[in-house]
Each structure stands twice: as structure tokens, then as C-alpha cells.
Design a protein with these regions (language model features):
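Small beta-barrel nucleic-acid-binding modules, primarily SNase/OB-fold domains
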Residues: 2-141
Length: 141
């Protein structure tokens, strides 16, 4: 390979690399989201509680929401099962969640209310769920 062909090859590789980065061929932002909508652009999520996973996670119109600042026993424990049964009373109800912008696993994180009442506060008052102050990012409790 002569020198001019070598320089031409290097020029092509460098040009392609710059073009690829500039136009996002290798960008992580282009990966598909697991949710039905891009929740990063949503500050308030309103809808019906369509599924209850446990005491601190439910789905609104199929979008999983982790309740901010709330710590409930896991479903694998007797107390967790009791809390989940209590939480299922809210299935089918309308909820309004202010999303914090955080995401954990497949869930968006938010402070939610049902019928104008703070859901986390209700859970702390009515069940053995506790405040998880580390995740009370807006200092609500």
C-alpha cells in the first residue's frame, strides 16, 4: 500500500468516527425504553392504578412507580403480604404522581396522592411501612 492510499484510509476512518459520534450512532439515548412512554419528559403522571406490586410500588396505566421515601416489607415476608393486600384496595383508583426524575430498576420514582391524600403518609399511618429518609429527596416528611 503506498503512502497516499494509507493516508486516504486513515482519513476515511477518522471522518466516519467523527460523523458517527456527532449524529449519535453510538449514543445510549437512542436505546428503546422499557416503558410505553418516555417518562423522563413527564413531571406529573396521572392515571388509574392498574396493578399493585407491593406496598411501595404500583403501576399507573401500566407504568411502574416506586413511591419515594417509603420503605415497606417485601412480599416474601408475612408482613409484606399483609401490606400488599392493604395496598390492593387502591387498585382501580385515580392517582397523581409528581415524579422526582429518578429511576430504579424499571420504575420511575415519585410522590403520589390518591383522592387528594398523600399515599406514602397513608401507608405510614395505616401499615407498618416506614419513612426512608434517605430517599425523601424533596423533604416532604
Amino acid at each position: 500500500m503506498n503512502i497516499s492510499m494509507r493516508y486516504f484510509s486513515i482519513l476515511v476512518v477518522v471522518s466516519f468516527s467523527i460523523f458517527s459520534f456527532k449524529y449519535g450512532f453510538w449514543s445510549e439515548a437512542s436505546e428503546a425504553s422499557d416503558s410505553k412512554i418516555d417518562t423522563r419528559a413527564v413531571s406529573v403522571l396521572k392515571g388509574t392504578i392498574t396493578h399493585v406490586r407491593d406496598g411501595d410500588t404500583f403501576e399507573i396505566n401500566g407504568i411502574p412507580v416506586r413511591i419515594s421515601a417509603l420503605d415497606c416489607a417485601e412480599n416474601s415476608t408475612p408482613e409484606g403480604k399483609k401490606i400488599t393486600r392493604f395496598t390492593k384496595k387502591f387498585q382501580g383508583k385515580q392517582a397523581v404522581c409528581e415524579l422526582t426524575g429518578a429511576k430504579t430498576y424499571d420504575r420511575v420514582v415519585g410522590y403520589c396522592s390518591i383522592a387528594g391524600k398523600d399515599f406514602a403518609q397513608t401507608m405510614m399511618n395505616e401499615t407498618s411501612c416506614k419513612l426512608w429518609a434517605k430517599y425523601d429527596v424533596w423533604d416532604r416528611y
